[in-house]
Every structure is written in C-alpha cells, then in structure tokens.
Regions:
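Active-site microenvironments that recognize anionic phosphate/pyrophosphate groups
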Residues: 1-151, 157-234, 251-256, 260-263, ...
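Gly/Ser/Thr-rich active-site loops/lids in small-molecule metabolic enzymes
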Residues: 236-246
Length: 330
C-alpha cells in the first residue's frame, strides 16, 4: 500500500510505493485523436471539436495514468509507534500544453503559452477548494537526461502536507517579515532593480533576474512587481499575456544561448490557506510571502558539497549572457 512516512530526524516526508510499470512504446497517448488512451480528462480549453475526451483542444488536463497521489483516497493520519504516517491523498495531473507533439516552451507562440498559464491558475483554484490538500506544486521539466523527447506537458502535484521547499521558503519569509515588517521578496526587487547588474528583463508587471546567490549557472527567477502571495490570484487579463511573452523570451534566449538545454520550471505559490491545521498557521502569509517562478537550467549538473551549492559562473555574468541572447523586441 502507498503511504507517506515522516523521518523524525530531518522533519522530511518520504513516499513509499511500488515501482511504477514502464510505459509501453507506441502511439503517443497525448496527441489529438488518441484521447481514448488517457484517463477521462479533468479540464480542457477547446476551440472546436466533438466535446470532452475528443480532439479540438488547445490545452488539456488528464490524471497521470499511475498517479503518486489520488483524490479518491481517504486521508488517514496515523501514529506507528513513535513514527508518523499519512495516506498519499491528493492529485497527480498532467497539463498537455499543446496539440503539437514537438512543441516546446521556446517554440510555441506566446498566445499558446498564455493559455497554459491560465490553466495553471484554473487547476490551482480548483484543487484548493479541497481543504484536505495543503500544498500544490506546478512544475515543468524539459529535456530530462535519459528520457526520450515526449509530448509537452506540465505536472500538477497536490499533497496533504506542505512541500519541504515551500516550508523553508515560508519560514524564511515569515522570519524576515517579523524582524523588518517588510516582504523579503519586495526588498529583493528594490535591491535588484536599483543595481540592475543581475536584471535580465524589466517590464511594467514583472522582473526577470538571476538571483544574488544562484544555486546553478543561469538559474532565473520571474517575480511580479506587485506584491501577492498566490499565483492564482495574480493572473488576470493584463498579467497573463505579459508573463507569457517574458517566459517565451526567456526560453528562446536559453535555446539561442545554450542550444536548447534541459531546465525545470517551478511555480512558487502560497499553500492552500483553506487547510490551516493550527490557529496561527500562516497568520501573516499574505504580507510576508511573494509568489514567483523559478527556472533551474541544467538541474542535473548541480554541484554540491555537504549541502552547499557550488556555482562556477557568477550570477552577474549569467545575467549578462541572458541579456545578450534575448531576442530584440519587434
């Protein structure tokens, strides 16, 4: 039986489950016309076509065929002697980003990428209606080493706990706010836009930058200039097209400058505020946390020594390279 077990020495959760069966080679189940090969769709944007579970879609959401987390499970929190266990209730979804099998975030038109960003918002809003879901990760991996090219998709993972990375970020943001009564990320924005040496792109609503202590060469953040803790509350008719144009420009710059490298996109947004367990949980989160997007370029090349990241390229040089590779605006 699948279950989540907590390591009390590190405060981390581990998912224990049998190894998934390898996918059979053959027809791509995510291309138009093969909708019968996937579980029934959860959501879709369609311009035409016969309706649900048929062709004509522009963006489509389906459950993973062998999901890590299932919404049908009963949430059970149990003590096993001194240890803690939780059933992996949640959701494991794939957002099929384009009908085209060979599309990438660099090759698709900004309008198509904008539709993907709207679907990110829709899935976060829908899943956060479930108070047993505590945190949701929206991620996108491109060109994972050892994995053949496949239909473009993002992954949505909803879980009954808070992800370790989210928990660390929330703690740092809260402690900074408690000490200074200011948002950590708003201060980063003021510092970086004033200095400019690590800024790659600056628009009315967003800043693209290489962070001061980048863990990887060309690690890039996209931060909204207007404070807000949740991605889904910030995406609107003005923000979505601007963010799509920026991300399109970033991925094309990476392709032009590095020859289509691997990367991982992560949407960092507040956990599900409906799932508060204790009275004081996230009491200041709307003031202290700031949603953003992180792009980790070639994450498989991360170099660490005892948990300390070692970057062989300074963030200032990395930002300069990205500025040079960015396609001039028409």
């Amino acid at each position: 039986m699948d279950e989540m077990r907590k390591d009390p020495t590190r405060g981390q959760w581990v998912l224990v489950r049998p190894k998934a069966k390898a996918a059979q080679a053959g027809e791509c189940p995510y291309c138009p016309g093969a909708e019968h090969l996937t579980p029934p769709e959860i959501a879709a944007y369609r311009k035409d076509g016969p309706g649900p579970n048929g062709p004509g879609w522009t963006v489509r959401v389906v459950p993973e065929s062998d999901p890590y987390f299932r919404v049908e499970r009963e949430l059970v929190r149990e003590g096993v002697g001194m240890f803690d266990m939780i059933t992996p209730r949640g959701a494991s979804e794939l957002i099929l980003e384009s009908p085209r099998h060979d599309d990438t975030l660099a090759s698709m038109e900004p309008e198509q990428l904008e539709a993907v960003l709207w679907m990110y918002r829709d899935r976060l809003l829908d899943l956060k209606r479930d108070s047993q879901i505590r945190d949701i990760l929206v991620s996108r991996r491109h060109r994972k080493p050892g994995v053949p090219p496949h239909h473009p998709y993002s992954r949505v993972t909803a879980i009954p706990i808070v992800f370790d990375e989210t928990r660390r970020e929330l703690r740092e943001a809260r402690e900074y706010y408690q000490y200074k009564r200011r948002c950590l990320y708003c201060d980063i924005l003021r510092q970086e836009t004033g200095a400019e040496e690590r800024v790659v792109r600056l628009t009315k609503a967003f800043v693209v930058l290489v962070p001061y202590a980048a863990r990887l060469p060309l690690e890039t953040w996209v931060l909204p200039r207007q404070h807000g803790c949740s991605y889904e509350d910030a995406i609107n008719g003005e923000a979505a097209p601007e963010l799509a144009r920026l991300l399109s420009g970033l991925f094309r710059a990476l392709e032009r400058g590095l020859g289509d490298p691997s990367y991982e996109l992560l949407v960092h947004t507040a956990p599900n505020l409906r799932s508060r367990i204790l009275q004081g949980d996230w009491a200041t989160i709307r003031d202290d946390y700031h949603w953003h997007i992180e792009v980790l370029v070639q994450p498989e090349r991360a170099n660490r020594l005892g948990g300390i990241f070692i970057s062989e390229t300074s963030p200032e040089v990395a930002a300069s390279r990205l500025r040079e590779a960015w396609e001039p605006e028409a």
